[in-house]
């Protein structure tokens, strides 16, 4: 790989603008990245990060007037091939691999080695396998070039994408939310690899909503807001307050602050005793009180989501009892749960929660449209007003209620789904990874909604893999391990809710876990 002078920018994007019909996505944005630098790019959803990266990758063409320079020389990137030839590689959140091809075939895609007569010769798969062995070994891959990509884990597939970038001699590597599907161990391995690539002189643009990752990796951080460049901070000047203020343009004080009164331990809303599904959930019990926010933490695979779906009636129970308001609740289906005042926000809003091709109005109304029936016909005006009220109450950013929900940012999609649940007037709300894939501003608004619900006497269960979030919003925390509740923190236990205590309980790694249990 060609080495560049680290004191000179490798990439300069100057005055980049992009206009879509009726929307100005970027307005004169500039970005400078040096070789051997991890440069994070932050901003709320809709700030323009993806548009800027798609211009760099050749997927979009910028408006006239801006320019892109590599090693100080202006360059035209008029398509993905031009970006690749310029040394730019992008690893998107949705990986771009062919699962039915081998690792080597994916690495060489579009550059296949052939026998005989140039482009018309037969593909030389053996030569391609030999040709990518070195890069796989260099990156620490424990799979071979002839492995089918479809048999690899998400983390391994991500490694194939990185190997392809390195093999094409990319000098600028863009990574868009790369840790979203990864476990903690896989994330650590990815960070080790990113630092290795930085040491080799690559310029890395890293996009993430996760503050902890930004602090751990970044040499510098640039912030976009509403399609405009706000500023760049060096590592030494990073702080949550400054970053959040730059991203949202307003003060978000007390980001995780509990703003509801202490719950009444005598007002029990939900009681779960020894429930099991015959698989992941192996006998769990919990209590939830009116006005309480109960956090559920644990490692991936601990059974948190499965427990939530079991309580909600989305999965059958093989044993155990659930009481809602002191009365036994059969919970044979989600409809039963909703009718009883118990609702569940799924962790996968796009596949299990929202109707992406339907409007915001219809998504909000779909659980309560029966209320609008008059003589066999729906009162559309009433449903439209309900949607407008929900949009205002939850600060959903949409031009109008008839826009397709699939066109919204992740944070606004999440608030549409929350609106639908809240229209049922629940007594108990289970939120499974409520801020996954949403930006800082939307997170703050979701935390406000949680606090408002608790103040109104709703019992809220929050399942989250982000420990600062769990610690910040929850009155008590239950930690799951291997399908069971391993212990409880906060509340009557007196045990402080800390990251160390949660990890100890989740892993069973210390006597602290046993003591808390």
Swiss-Prot record:
- Give binding positions for ATP: 43-50
Q: Give disulfide pairs as residue numbers.
A: none
InterPro entries listed in its UniProt record = AAA+_ATPase, ABC_carbohydrate_import_ATPase, ABC_transporter-like_ATP-bd, ABC_transporter-like_CS, P-loop_NTPase
Name where it mostly resides. membrane
Location of the ABC transporter domain: 11-251, 263-507
- UniProt membrane topology term: Peripheral membrane protein
Point out the signal peptide segment.
none
**What EC number is given for this enzyme?**
7.5.2.7
- The top EC class is translocase
Q: Which reaction does it catalyse?
A: D-ribose(out) + ATP + H2O = D-ribose(in) + ADP + phosphate + H(+)
Q: Which UniProt keywords apply?
A: ATP-binding, Cell inner membrane, Cell membrane, Membrane, Nucleotide-binding, Repeat, Sugar transport, Translocase, Transport
Query: What are the GO MF terms of this UniProt record?
Result: ABC-type D-ribose transporter activity; ATP binding; ATP hydrolysis activity
Question: GO CC annotations?
Answer: plasma membrane
Say yes or no: keyword Membrane present. yes
Instruction: Tell me if Nuclease is a UniProt keyword of this record.
Output: no
Subcellular location(s) per record = Cell inner membrane
According to the record's subunit comment, the protein's assembly and interactions are: The complex is composed of an ATP-binding protein (RbsA), two transmembrane proteins (RbsC) and a solute-binding protein (RbsB).
Which family does the entry's similarity section mention? Belongs to the ABC transporter superfamily. Ribose importer (TC 3.A.1.2.1) family.
- Known function: Part of the ABC transporter complex RbsABC involved in ribose import. Responsible for energy coupling to the transport system.
Q: What protein am I looking at?
A: Ribose import ATP-binding protein RbsA 2
Lineage summary: Bacteria, Pseudomonadati, Pseudomonadota, Betaproteobacteria, Burkholderiales
Identify the gene encoding this protein: rbsA2
């Amino acid at each position: 790989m060609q080495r560049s002078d680290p004191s000179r920018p490798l990439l300069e994007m100057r005055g980049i603008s992009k206009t879509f019909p009726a929307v100005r996505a970027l307005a004169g944005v500039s970005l400078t990245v040096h070789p051997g630098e991890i440069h994070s790019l932050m901003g709320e959803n809709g700030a323009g990060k993806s548009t800027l990266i798609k211009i760099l990758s050749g997927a979009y063409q910028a408006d006239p007037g801006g320019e892109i320079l590599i090693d100080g020389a202006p360059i035209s990137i008029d398509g993905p091939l031009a970006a690749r030839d310029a040394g730019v590689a992008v690893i998107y959140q949705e990986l771009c691999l062919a699962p039915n091809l081998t690792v080597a075939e994916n690495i060489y895609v579009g550059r296949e080695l052939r026998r005989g007569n140039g482009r018309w010769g037969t593909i030389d798969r053996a030569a391609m396998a030999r040709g990518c062995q070195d890069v796989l070994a260099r990156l620490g891959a424990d799979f071979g070039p002839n492995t089918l990509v479809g048999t690899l884990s998400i983390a391994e597939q991500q490694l194939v994408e990185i190997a392809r970038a390195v093999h094409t001699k990319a000098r600028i590597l863009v990574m868009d939310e790369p840790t979203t599907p990864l476990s903690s161990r896989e994330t650590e391995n990815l960070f080790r690899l990113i630092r290795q690539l930085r040491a080799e002189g690559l310029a890395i643009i890293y996009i993430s909503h996760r503050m902890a990752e930004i602090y751990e990796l970044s040499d510098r951080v640039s912030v976009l807001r509403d399609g405009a460049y706000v500023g760049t901070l060096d590592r030494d000047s990073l702080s949550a307050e400054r970053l959040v203020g730059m991203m949202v343009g307003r003060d978000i004080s007390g980001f995780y602050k509990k703003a509801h009164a202490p719950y009444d331990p005598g007002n029990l809303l939900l009681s779960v005793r020894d429930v099991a599904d015959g698989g992941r959930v192996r006998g769990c019990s919990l209590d939830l009180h009116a006005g309480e926010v109960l956090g559920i933490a644990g490692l991936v695979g601990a059974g948190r989501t499965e427990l939530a779906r079991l309580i909600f009636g989305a999965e059958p129970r093989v044993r155990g009892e659930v009481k809602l308001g002191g009365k036994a609740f059969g919970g044979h289906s989600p409809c039963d749960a909703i009718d009883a005042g118990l609702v569940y926000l799924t962790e996968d809003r796009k596949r299990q929660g929202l109707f992406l091709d339907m409007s915001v109005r219809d998504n909000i109304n779909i659980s309560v449209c029966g209320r609008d029936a008059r003589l066999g016909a729906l009162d559309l005006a009433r449903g439209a007003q309900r949607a407008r009220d929900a949009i205002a109450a939850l600060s959903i950013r949409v031009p109008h209620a008839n826009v397709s929900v699939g066109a919204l940012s992740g944070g606004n999609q999440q608030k549409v789904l929350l609106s639908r649940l809240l229209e049922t007037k629940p007594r108990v709300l289970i939120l499974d990874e409520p801020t996954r894939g949403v930006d800082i501003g939307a997170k703050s608004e979701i935390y406000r909604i949680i606090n408002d619900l608790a103040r109104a006497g709703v019992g809220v269960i929050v399942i989250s893999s982000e420990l600062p979030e769990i610690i910040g919003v929850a009155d008590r925390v239950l930690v799951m391990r291997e399908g069971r509740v391993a212990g409880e923190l906060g509340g009557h236990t007196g045990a402080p809710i800390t990251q160390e205590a949660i990890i100890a309980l989740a892993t069973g790694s210390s006597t602290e876990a046993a003591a808390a249990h």
